[in-house]
């Protein structure tokens, strides 16, 4: 592997409030994420999940409360975290190798390291290509390699697979999981996709209107498939919460 990442960062979120104007976006969020854990945050659009991620990244200032990493308050940009977005945000005027090298600050033997990272994400030999010739999934592979380049202890994923087709999305889920299992960074994923959350996460946090309304452990063996025993039950539990359906009645019966 290109880089040896240390064990992931532990995150504590303590009574986090965020207000934009008169709108309360986060309302007393309390959560603990253990080092090396993979946690997914799910919720409807506008529930506050991406705002929460930005606070962990140090890109927002809380109205009150705080986020701590390994016991220290995060003030300013979190230097031990890297973000992946739905848009790969590659530099169109630089080739693929240099885009990955940005994560290495283009120092030392960055070209060798960047090439090794591209191999890790399944793009061996594509370093001289321009971003314009890559598919959406390939661009996200480059973005993942760039995110891993600095050896982050925390990988923040803001719906990075949301714009991909179903097959490419599955391939990327498998890649993210494989690299997480190897490097054991802490991963925090924001997604609308409940199936994706069950596929990847050790634990799922459900947010509604800026509050945590459910936390669900996912103890299924890895690698996971949607047809595995227990997968559909966990998915249905989360969907029932999001849709406001009483848990004692199966979702399919509720919708008939």
Curated annotation (Swiss-Prot):
It is found in: Cell membrane. It catalyses: ATP + H2O + aliphatic sulfonate-[sulfonate-binding protein]Side 1 = ADP + phosphate + aliphatic sulfonateSide 2 + [sulfonate-binding protein]Side 1. GO terms for molecular function: ATP binding; ATP hydrolysis activity. One of its GO terms (cellular component) is plasma membrane. Keywords: ATP-binding, Cell membrane, Membrane, Nucleotide-binding, Translocase, Transport. Residues 11-234 form the ABC transporter domain. It is a peripheral membrane protein. CDD domains: ABC_NrtD_SsuB_transporters. Belongs to the ABC transporter superfamily. Aliphatic sulfonates importer (TC 3.A.1.17.2) family. The complex is composed of two ATP-binding proteins (SsuB), two transmembrane proteins (SsuC) and a solute-binding protein (SsuA). Part of the ABC transporter complex SsuABC involved in aliphatic sulfonates import. Responsible for energy coupling to the transport system. This is Aliphatic sulfonates import ATP-binding protein SsuB 2. The gene is ssuB2.
